[in-house]
Amino acid sequence: MGYVVSTFYRFVHLSNYYDIQSVLKEFCVQHDIKGTIILAEQGINATIAGAQSALNQFFSFLDLDNRLKDIQHHESFSTHNPFSKMKVKLRNELVRLGIENFDNSVCGEYVSPQNWDDLISRSDVYTIDTRNTYEINFGKFKNAINPQTKCFRDFPEWAVSWASDKVNQDPIIAMYCTGGIRCEKSTAFMKNLGFNKVYHLKGGILEYFKSTKNTNNLWEGDCFTFDDRIVVDDNLVPGRVKCVSCDVHVTREEMKSVTRGNVLCFNCREVAKV
């Protein structure tokens, strides 16, 4: 049996987000759906996996709430369920930028996957990867700037420093991330800093892979995923990952305990404990 992996998010006011937690958890458990859903007053952010029929029922269930109706989701596939359990978490901030009461309603302009290559190929465009360094190490777009962040909360400090000599130049900025939520929020931050021409990849890297197959080879490497697959290639096929210490391919079981891109085989992990 194959599994569908679905990522989705929506910034929307959910005043009763804490009441939704148990309802979503119960539905997912009943339909053998696993993964992580994050709920906050600002909306919902999730990656879940299960049978296609189960996910179809899940999104029909979400449609019952007008705030979550017709939510756009991006699908990829796996031979196994890349999640071991179902989690529905409550957060004060949907995606943690670390700035209290930050308003991300005024954000950048979407660019479709089909138009993305033309944008980032321009010599007057700064392409910024809003993911963390451990993710970028597996792959990125050609010539993209790596902010060298360990977590998304580090991004504002980097952005303020980077912007200090560029705001007055009124540059064109193109931003991207895995599924779209971090680049959407980061474009709002860049707009807040005074940049006007700010764009972000609609649907993120995963939708870009699905829509374009990386035809122009502007993507280099694999894309890190926050599940047991660790990475997928530009055909959305789980890649083979090597241990960062001994360079052997790690097994699927070893991948299940990988944290933040620190890929170690069992042997090297044991050595590291000594």
UniProtKB/Swiss-Prot annotation:
Q: Which SUPFAM superfamilies match?
A: Rhodanese/Cell cycle control phosphatase
Q: Known EC number(s)?
A: 1.14.-.-
Q: Does this UniProt record's set of keywords contain Oxidoreductase?
A: yes
UniProt-listed SMART domains? RHOD
**Protein name as annotated:** tRNA uridine(34) hydroxylase
Which gene specifies this protein's sequence?
trhO
Question: EC class of this enzyme?
Answer: oxidoreductase
**Main role?**
Catalyzes oxygen-dependent 5-hydroxyuridine (ho5U) modification at position 34 in tRNAs.
**Keyword Chaperone: yes or no?**
no
Q: Name one GO biological process term.
A: tRNA modification
